[in-house]
Structures are given as structure tokens and as C-alpha cells.
């Protein structure tokens, strides 16, 4: 991808976002033997409901295929970041990093937080490198820990 343009997703993108979600998270869940992961059983109806409450960003390839996306929602000063996803064949190109940083810059907040599976090391370590710190965890299955991470802005003197 020569140029990476981040755009707001539209309601018409929801079916493609569900497809991206299955392709991005499916292999990871299978690798962890977590085939009943909630993210894999989400319905189109649920995604439409969720879409209406969030700001969703997307990156498309030259053919108009959505290859990356993230969503965010600010509630009482806290930005929840969710569904950072990139098609496997487009990973390691900076798409996820750009989307992740862009959602934080577009939505004013006092604190940002997210949750991720601690056993999926690449995204977990990426979030740590981006300044997020663990504040809570919960066992969700055999050998599976859901980690809650947060980041607060640096304050000056």
C-alpha cells in the first residue's frame, strides 16, 4: 500500500468490518484453542448496534477493500479503544499503529483504556510500547487471561 489514508467508516461498511473481524481474529483464536471467543460469534445486528455508539476508522487498499480498522468511544472522559484489527496479509506495515494513534488523537479524552488477551503477545507488547499499563486482569478460560490496560496523559510541572 503506497499511501495509507485513514477515513471514518460508514454504516455501509459494517458487513465488511464483520468480515475483517473474522479474518483478523479468527486465526489468533484458533491458535489459542479459543474457538468460542465472543468476538467470533458476534452478529451483524450486534455490530450495527455497536457501530452506532462508536467512532470507527478504516483503511482501505487500492481496490476499496477494508484492510484495517479500529473503533473508540469516549464516556465520562475515558476513551475505550476496541477492535484494532488488520488483515493478516497486511500486518507489519504500520497500519495498526497508525489507526491506534489516530483514534486517540481524534477523540479527546483524559484516559484511554482497552482490553486484550495477554497470551497474544504481539498486540499486548505493542500496547505496552505505546505507553499503556496493565491495571486489571481476568481469567477467561484455560490458559487465557484478559488484560485491561490504560494510559493517562503525561502531566507537566
Spans of model-derived segments:
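A short beta-loop-alpha structural element at the N-terminal edge
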Residues: 4-19
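A short helix-loop-beta-strand connector motif used in the catalytic cores of GNAT acetyltransferases and
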Residues: 46-58, 80
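Conserved beta-strand in the GNAT
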Residues: 58, 65-73, 80-85
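Conserved acetyl-CoA-binding loop-helix of GNAT-fold acetyltransferases
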Residues: 86, 92-105, 129
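Conserved GNAT acetyl-CoA-binding A-motif
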Residues: 106-118
Amino acid at each position: 500500500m503506497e499511501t495509507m489514508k485513514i477515513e471514518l467508516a460508514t454504516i455501509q461498511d459494517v458487513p465488511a468490518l464483520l468480515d475483517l473481524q473474522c479474518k483478523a481474529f479468527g486465526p489468533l483464536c484458533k491458535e489459542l484453542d479459543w474457538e468460542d471467543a465472543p468476538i467470533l460469534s458476534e452478529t451483524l445486528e450486534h455490530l450495527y448496534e455497536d457501530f452506532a455508539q462508536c467512532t470507527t476508522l478504516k483503511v482501505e487498499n487500492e481496490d476499496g477493500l477494508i484492510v484495517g480498522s479500529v473503533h473508540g468511544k469516549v464516556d465520562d472522559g475515558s476513551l475505550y479503544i476496541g477492535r484494532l484489527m488488520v488483515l493478516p496479509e497486511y500486518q507489519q506495515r504500520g497500519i495498526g499503529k497508525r489507526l491506534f494513534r489516530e483514534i486517540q488523537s481524534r477523540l479527546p479524552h483524559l484516559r484511554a483504556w482497552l482490553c486484550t488477551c495477554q497470551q497474544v503477545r504481539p498486540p499486548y507488547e505493542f500496547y505496552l510500547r505505546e505507553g499503556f499499563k496493565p491495571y486489571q486482569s481476568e481469567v477467561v478460560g484455560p490458559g487465557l487471561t484478559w488484560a485491561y490496560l490504560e494510559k493517562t496523559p503525561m502531566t507537566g510541572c
